[in-house]
């Protein structure tokens, strides 16, 4: 994985969150200031809000990541770390990684990114100046929904030495041998699987975009994506995750998901099975406003089933709206 990410060293962990929290604790200390994108993986913000702030007296500034002026203003306050995800959770917004990395180097801020949904096949943040890359190996790297693990990669040997000898050892988030073997197995087919995932997802996204019952589609591969210039600059391909909003109520959107037959219901994507869910329909209005997303947002993951079968399943669910 270090070689695929063009890093000098990698460290594997027992979960993605074990990797994430180890990176944060390696860079930060009590009283540190952290900058975090608003739409990162929800457990990351819960870790910051429920542990780092109350127990370590850390300060956290949330930013969109797209407003470089906002990012620079936050960095001027003396931050230790900026936490990124691009494309980000829920609506797959991308941020200009090189521009942010350049600002971070200017102000002495470390940068960390969750690169899980891109994998090293489609995006290499270290080449753009990002300091630490994390992958949840439970997703595409594992590829079969039978593995929990995480990995950190960096070009900074001293930082990786600290993460391995201190954070991983002290917190005990060490990957088991069976999980390591499963991750190696997954890496052997990663490229082939991603090519199929991407091809299927493109067909599904274009199908959704043309459907008059769909209000909005969020997918980095669509030609209509307003962030296309940034996407083409830093990505070599596209995830098979996407989200969309129906021109319908929350209840109708729930029924739409329940009427799907081939798509399973679940959140831990990355395996062979296509999945659908409404990740935020029980969220507070405050949470929705914070992340700037719709309650009835539907996220789907395109697995390895035939594209024509997935389209047929979506079509029959639309017909029952």
Where does each model-flagged region fall?
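Acidic-histidine catalytic/liganding microenvironments
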Residues: 4, 208-212, 260
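A common structural junction motif
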Residues: 171, 260-268, 317-321
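Conserved C-terminal alpha-helix-loop-beta "cap" of PLP-dependent enzymes
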Residues: 214-298, 302
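PLP-dependent enzyme catalytic core of the Aspartate aminotransferase-like
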Residues: 49-50, 73, 77, 193, ...
